[in-house]
């Protein structure tokens, strides 16, 4: 499908890698392996958009009866430009509440360090971690597919796609913070 779109002139200007890794719960093993053995040199990696748990809502938002949100973590830590691209994609299209509650270096949950984007960030690759927050089934066998909110995951995935699409079609790569 992607090759057909590219052949018809609708492809991105830059390459995209869709990377599925495992071993997160055992110490981010898959992403640690990848950054040591990347398909392309990490210096050529513009950004890492990490989607880790985006199909549900957390207890906080459930109690407020708010569904159209996503936690955004780390977007401006290495590149303010990346954060602005994400905000613009959201304001222009998806209009989710971007919740930065966990985007504080002193957050006791330390979510910034607990998902696969972290190995990229440690290697100076700008990241965004998209997360729906913890819920009662977090890291339990009871976290089953029937509990996914498919219209919501679609909207959140659209935000990730639109951010990625802007990144791969810009005339210049995003700049790192000084």
Give each language-model segment a name.
Residues 12, 41, 126, 173-174:
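Proline-rich low-complexity regions
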Residues 7, 109, 149:
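Generic anion/oxyanion-binding catalytic loop in active/binding sites
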Residues 16, 67-71, 141, 145:
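Glycine- and acidic
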Residues 22-129:
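Metal-dependent peptidase/peptidase-like ectodomains
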Residues 1-27, 160:
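Alpha-helical metal-binding/catalytic segments enriched in His/Glu/Asp
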Residues 7-11, 96-104, 171-177:
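Surface-exposed patches in mature extracellular/periplasmic domains of secreted proteins
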Residues 1-8, 37, 88-96, 123, ...:
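Structured segments of extracytoplasmic/periplasmic soluble domains
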Residues 3, 131-178:
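His/Asp/Glu-rich mid-to-C-terminal helical/loop segments that flank catalytic regions of hydrolases
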């Amino acid at each position: 499908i992607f090759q057909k779109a590219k052949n018809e002139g609708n492809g991105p200007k830059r390459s995209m890698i869709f990377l599925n890794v495992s071993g997160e719960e055992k110490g981010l093993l898959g992403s640690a392996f990848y950054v040591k053995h990347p398909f392309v040199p990490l210096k050529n990696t513009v950004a890492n958009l990490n989607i880790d748990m985006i199909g549900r809502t957390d207890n906080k938002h459930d109690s407020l009866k708010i569904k159209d949100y996503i936690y955004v973590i780390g977007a401006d830590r290495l590149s303010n430009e990346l954060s602005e691209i994400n905000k613009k994609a959201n304001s222009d299209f998806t209009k989710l509440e971007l919740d930065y509650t966990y985007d504080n270096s002193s957050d006791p949950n330390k979510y910034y360090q607990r998902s696969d984007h972290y190995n990229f960030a440690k290697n100076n690759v700008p990241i965004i971690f998209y997360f729906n927050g913890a819920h009662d089934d977090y890291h339990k066998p009871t976290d089953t597919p029937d509990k996914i909110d498919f219209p919501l995951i679609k909207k959140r995935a659209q935000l990730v796609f639109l951010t990625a699409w802007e990144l791969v079609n810009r005339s210049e790569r995003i700049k790192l913070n000084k």
